[in-house]
Amino acid sequence: MIEASKLKAGMTFEAEGKLIRVLEASHHKPGKGNTIMRMKLRDVRTGSTFDTTYRPDEKFEQAIIETVPAQYLYKMDDTAYFMNTDTYDQYEIPVANVEQELLYILENSDVKIQFYGSEVIGVTVPTTVELTVAETQPSIKGATVTGSGKPATLETGLVVNVPDFIEAGQKLIINTAEGTYVSRA
């Protein structure tokens, strides 16, 4: 059992028959009354997100999640296909459950598949990935003063803010936790 006050982003627990992943968690002390935990959560099975509050002393069953190395094969219709690189077993995951992760990976990319018992519940991508710029505004000479950057669409459809000197066709290193530009590859 784990108390609500100990739940952090990325942890998974069971509540009301649902498998829930914590997206954001914060302590909140109102002017009057007791401390509460405000949380943004995702139902792992359905993909739906919701906000809720818990008392810090509420207890939940922590879910034991196992991960295995895998490779992203392809996406067809509403299903993404992955292969365990140790056993060569293939797994089908609904795109709705891994939509965010698919923005960071290309076919044949290495990932980790998350299991709850024998049920596939998600995918973990590397902390940084290398992606190519598909489309961005052209650079304007002498526009170095602003330093605000410009939006760039990458080959997976992800849109990130990049420095003005980045052009289409260049390979970039992207931080997957924050969805931000790190450097040129």
From Swiss-Prot:
Chief location of this protein within or outside the cell: cytoplasm
Xref: PROSITE patterns: EFP
Pathway(s): Protein biosynthesis; polypeptide chain elongation
Keywords: Cytoplasm, Elongation factor, Protein biosynthesis
NCBIfam families: efp, PRK00529.1
GO MF annotation list: translation elongation factor activity
Gene Ontology biological process: peptide biosynthetic process
Protein name, UniProt field: Elongation factor P
HAMAP family in the record: EF_P
Pfam families: EFP, EFP_N, Elong-fact-P_C
Domain of life per record: Bacteria
Subcellular location: Cytoplasm
GO CC terms, sorted: cytoplasm
Similarity comment text for this entry: Belongs to the elongation factor P family.
Function field: Involved in peptide bond synthesis. Stimulates efficient translation and peptide-bond synthesis on native or reconstituted 70S ribosomes in vitro. Probably functions indirectly by altering the affinity of the ribosome for aminoacyl-tRNA, thus increasing their reactivity as acceptors for peptidyl transferase.
